[in-house]
């Protein structure tokens, strides 16, 4: 089955579909560094760098050689949608979503998968959610939605995403994946995710070097399957001693509230500061790299550690500068979540 990814980023959702046996025909994104990463890791896929609003369906058909498209996937912003008052088609926040609708209308795939932040479900008292459903229902799709937690699907991170799935009328019901891990006590932990990676916090390690040990968990074995012997994207940030001493004040699983009272009143700190817990999944990975701390070492996680928390295999290499790499990882849909969704469509 063939897939077109309209807001592909570095390709987390596409990778999940690929792991489930789908063919990724094309990725489209305006972020050059993310698209470079997408192309490097999806070598058989075509790419278009540009604004989806200016890319026509004919452009897409030409690039993919007229092949049939079975699934359109992507995560367009939907915050501008509301049923209250007149539809503001010129609202710039609506244009990317409407471009997604346009491509689905023209390509008429059997399925579409639209992902977004969980808050989209309740935004404007549910009006945005209702508008999303209406737009695709008018095109002949049966649409349903669900908020899925990545941790239920083997990802060592508590990351919730709103997933809308549409099935062309007459092609069957909408299905969602069943959690692979039901109980929180069985979630994949931070330690299970990254304990085989060098964790030194007193030295800047080279960009590429060997693993600290053989795989210490089933998850690590999965992440290292097919990976080269040298590890990429594991450049450790060298913090100043003052920063390291501050991080050291945050206990495992703690946050800024655990800082001493005299520190809070005299020093700069960030309310987003959180230290991961070795025996729990990571909290939601963001696009920056200054708010979360390693569960053991007095530093921020590396790009590779964040990628592990997102379920990117070690064979997946991120391009661009370090800030761009962190952004790509933080913006991505965890591949294992994408794979679980894709497998349901394939049944």
Ranges and model annotations:
Residues 2-108, 118-122, 127-130, 137:
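Core alpha/beta nucleotide-donor-binding catalytic domains of modification enzymes
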Residues 6, 121, 125, 153-157, ...:
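Aromatic-acidic/polar surface patches that form glycan- and anion
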Residues 43, 76-77, 109, 156, ...:
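Proline-centered helix-kink/hinge sites
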Residues 58-67, 83-263:
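Class I S-adenosyl-L-methionine
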Residues 73-78, 168, 289, 313-314:
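Short, small-residue-rich loop/turn micro-motifs
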Residues 215-347:
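C-terminal target-recognition/interaction regions appended to catalytic cores
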